[in-house]
Amino acid sequence: MSSTPVLAPVPGRALPLSEVPDPVFSQGMVGYGAAVDPPRQVVDAIAPVSGKILKLLPHAYVIMTAEGLGVLVHLGLDTVGLDGAGFTTHVAQGDAVTAGQPVITYDVPAIVAAGLSPVVPVVVMDERDPANITVGTAVGSGSDIDVGATLFTANKQ
């Protein structure tokens, strides 16, 4: 079994996915993982794993690891409707990235001003078994997590 640490892409309060106010994430429809409620300031969202940028949108990105793990970072909820406002990308789709590398600058105050939730779900795409995700202690306690700290570990058979 391989284990991949998945880093917090932004600082803030670590949350279990069940507390994300969107059933697509809270019910594990796209996969399992955890989330971060960021501070109300502009932050750089980093790559939570090393790999290739498989998909890059202004408000979300998917990184595929060498082991075939697809990790989605979604900056805020319902932010697709902002057409990129509040987000500045620093990489291109297809780029190789290293865990900890800045991917998108996220203007959290702009998202809040638009009346949207700034919560950042981080999920292993297509993971159907929550037992394969081991959340970090910050997630279980709802405490603050630093950017780049381990948010959860993805275990793959």
Task: Kindly give the residue locations of the regions a language model identified.
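Contiguous, well-folded functional domains in the mature portion of proteins
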Residues: 1-157
